[in-house]
């Protein structure tokens, strides 16, 4: 198989994306799910945004919270000079000094999903507004890295749903990329990089998934089965890294 890089790369950059709020800036547009719909190539993009901080001593954290039964973005502000116990060296997150990655306190960006369309798969126009925005209950820290699987006339979108409790995998479906139906978390934290097969095998849906053990073992690929795309089980190890890696 011959593979060539597109001479028009990158297809999308942060400069192509309009922030969802005036006080936000675009940090990245990446890790897109891709499919075809009505003669167009659809990219469902992860768009990462962060708060514009005018004070260099401040780190602003956007999160989604439930307020009066509505989902709203709230901003938490840390002053570096007042928080010597915290580590701000990695611009992607705030963590406790001397602790491992699992002690991340907050992410500095909030990701949503946005649609870009193309007639030729090269030149894309990205929507001005988010297609799907995170909710407080499942995605208070953002929704990331969508993957699209078409089964019959329905497009199933699995994506990483992030909260303070970890990164799991949730499911959304659509028939037209205008209306979306949420189905909730299908793999609990920490489990991500899910790939749903486009056809049943022996009458059941099948998916690769990647649980992340924190004690014994390493992140490796597992395979799971489901009768309805919601309830997954029959997990078994599929493959992993070699012993000399």
Which residues does each PLM region occupy?
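Beta-rich carbohydrate-recognition and catalytic domains
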Residues: 1-141, 149-195, 199-245
């Amino acid at each position: 198989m011959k593979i060539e890089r597109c001479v028009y790369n990158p297809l999308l950059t942060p400069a192509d994306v309009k922030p969802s709020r005036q006080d936000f800036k675009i940090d990245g547009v990446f890790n897109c799910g891709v499919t075809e719909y009505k003669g167009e190539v659809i990219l469902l993009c992860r768009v990462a945004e962060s708060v514009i901080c005018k004070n260099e001593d401040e780190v602003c954290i956007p999160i989604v919270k439930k307020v009066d039964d509505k989902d709203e973005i709230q901003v938490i502000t840390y002053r570096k000079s007042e928080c010597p116990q915290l580590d701000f060296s990695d611009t992607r997150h705030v963590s406790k000094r001397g602790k491992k990655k699992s002690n991340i306190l907050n992410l500095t960006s909030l990701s949503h999903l946005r649609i870009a369309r193309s007639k030729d798969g090269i030149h894309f126009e990205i929507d001005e507004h988010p297609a799907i925005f995170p909710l407080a209950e499942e995605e208070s820290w953002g929704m990331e890295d969508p993957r699209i699987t078409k089964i019959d006339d329905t497009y199933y979108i699995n994506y990483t749903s992030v909260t303070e409790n970890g990164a799991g995998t949730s499911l959304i479906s659509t028939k037209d990329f205008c209306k979306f139906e949420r189905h909730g978390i299908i793999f609990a934290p920490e489990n991500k990089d899910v790939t749903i097969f486009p056809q049943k095998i022996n009458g059941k849906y099948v998916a690769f998934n990647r649980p992340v053990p924190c004690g014994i073992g390493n992140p490796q690929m597992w395979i799971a089965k489901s009768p309805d795309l919601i309830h997954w089980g029959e997990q078994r190890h599929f493959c992993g890294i070699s012993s000399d890696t």
